[in-house]
Amino acid sequence: MGRRQSVVCKFIQRRSLHDLRMEADRISRTAEFMAFFRALESTGPAERRVLTDPFAANLLRPNLAGAVRLAQVPGMRKIVERFADLRVPGARTSAIARTWLIDEAWIRAIKEGIEQFVLLGAGFDCRAYRLNESARAAIFEVDHPAMLSLKRSRLGMARVDVPKNVRYAGIDFNRQSVGDVLAANGFDRGKRSMFVWERVTNYLTDEAVDAVLRYVGDCEPGSRIALTYVHTGLLDGSASFFGGKRILRDVAMIDEPWTFGFDPAALVEYLRARSLRLEYDAGAREYRKDCFGGHSAKMKGYDFYHVAIACVQTGTQPQT
């Protein structure tokens, strides 16, 4: 290779790396806020916090990591929480409650002998590292290549050892098949599996959501999926939610507009047509009560953000 070609190749490599980092920065914002909320919750008194994530703070950029450190100063935690709650009403408590809820489903799946876990849109999720009971199962973290690269880089900088049972698989949900990506990374459809699809569906197309749920519905009976979704009434204006208009404006401003939602009243039939049986569906008000009990009475906002859990049915064929 000549000198000129070598210079050109190095330039292209640098540009590709730069573009990857820029893309990672763009798509990591909401994932980072989720990690921030978990890190903030982890600073609370052990007897009061509902979850502990010792890895989340390592994934934050300096300003958010600084806020977590500030929260550990006596008397400052409530102030940091209040500031976060004023900025996006309900986001923090909703995020913590649904993380707790899905954690519980994950732990139950381990006890039931589930052999594979798939994090669809893994982002800065740390279940593969903090829920140690899953060490015997295969775990697949599926997300945009730029997101996975950023996550691995930050974990590496923090000297976090990635468990040997964790595999990373890059995907563009709107353009690639989940089945193809998982198959290429050793996923076995003949084993019961637990899918977690958190904080993703609201960014996709109808076709992409349909394709993923049909794939899950065609997996081994007894497999489950825990997913989050936005009430379609927020998107089309047919329902009103506290703080709803503000959050739509905010996500549009950071170039992460919400594009998809479900009508909760139609979800049972939608899933049944894809060989899935709905086991749980609740908005933030309900799952915050499940998590925080009576303390949830004063928590407001994000009622449009649902968690649903569904199981692959036995002996059924998906409808076309």
Task: Please state what every model-predicted region is.
Residues 203-215:
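A short, conserved alpha-helix within the catalytic core of class I
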Residues 178-189:
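Short amphipathic alpha-helix with an adjacent loop that forms part of the alpha/beta core around
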Residues 196:
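A conserved beta-strand element that flanks and buttresses the S-adenosyl-L-methionine
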Residues 220-232:
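Conserved beta-strand signature within the Rossmann-like core of class I S-adenosyl-L-methionine
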Residues 29, 238-320:
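Rossmann-like AdoMet/SAM-dependent catalytic core
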Residues 171-177:
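Conserved acidic residues
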